[in-house]
Design a protein with these regions (language model features):
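N-terminal beta1-alpha1-beta2 submodule of the flavodoxin-like/Rossmannoid cofactor-binding fold
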Residues: 1-106, 179, 183-193
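Short beta-strands and strand-loop turn motifs
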Residues: 6-7, 130-131, 169
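A structural motif corresponding to the C-terminal end of an alpha-helix
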Residues: 30, 76, 82, 122-123, ...
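Short, structured loop/turn "capping" segments at alpha-beta junctions
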Residues: 104-109, 161-165
Length: 193
């Protein structure tokens, strides 16, 4: 299985980085071919300008700065996203990766006369999100869990029709104990093995 792990956190020593490392190790231990895309470490540019947004713009696969990211996405059978949830969703760096790479011609194509896109990432069979929240699960449920909906209702439908999605979350991160963080790392490891 070829797995693309996408990590988005600006601090190399963060708990998110520990989750990233745990995920990569667990996936490799089961024999996956893991491609780690650390958006901050690779200095990904999340800025989508007006020219790139234009319908006349060449697709992302034809842009020298985005082509390698498109290739990595197209190689993957499985996606694992690791990031903190800030203000209800992923960091802007991750959202910029979606905006610039998951574009028409790569992730979907428009269907004439329809509002529904046609999926183009049919090789992707699963998406797993590993995230942390500063707030409680209850607060996130009341807010409608926009980050979770982004993955389960939007990204997943651009993948294989039977693609699975999993959401591994540590809530109340700002108040967790070392034992709670260790237990979450263990949960991540066991889920991905």
């Amino acid at each position: 299985m070829r797995t693309l792990v996408v990590h988005a956190h600006p601090v190399a020593t963060s708990f998110s980085a520990a989750l990233r490392d745990c995920a990569v190790e667990a996936l490799r231990s089961r024999g996956d071919d893991v491609d780690l895309l650390d958006l901050y470490a690779e200095d990904f540019d999340p800025y989508l300008d007006a020219d790139e947004w234009s319908p006349d713009s060449p697709g992302a696969e034809h842009r020298p700065d985005m082509g390698p990211y498109v290739t990595r996405l197209r190689r993957a059978d499985r996606l694992v996203f690791v990031y903190p949830t800030w203000f209800g969703g992923p960091p802007a760096m991750f959202k910029g990766w979606l905006d610039r790479v998951w574009v028409q011609g790569v992730a979907f194509e428009k269907v004439p006369g329809s509002n529904r896109p046609r999926a183009r990432l049919l090789h992707i069979r699963s998406i797993t999100v590993i995230t942390t929240y500063g707030s409680s699960r209850w607060v996130n449920v009341v807010e409608g869990e926009p980050g979770k909906r982004l993955v389960k209702r939007w990204l997943r439908v651009l993948c294989h029709p039977l693609a699975r999605s999993r959401w591994l979350a540590l809530y109340g991160m700002d108040r967790t104990t070392a034992a709670a963080r260790a237990a979450f790392l263990d949960r991540v490891e066991q889920t991905l093995k």
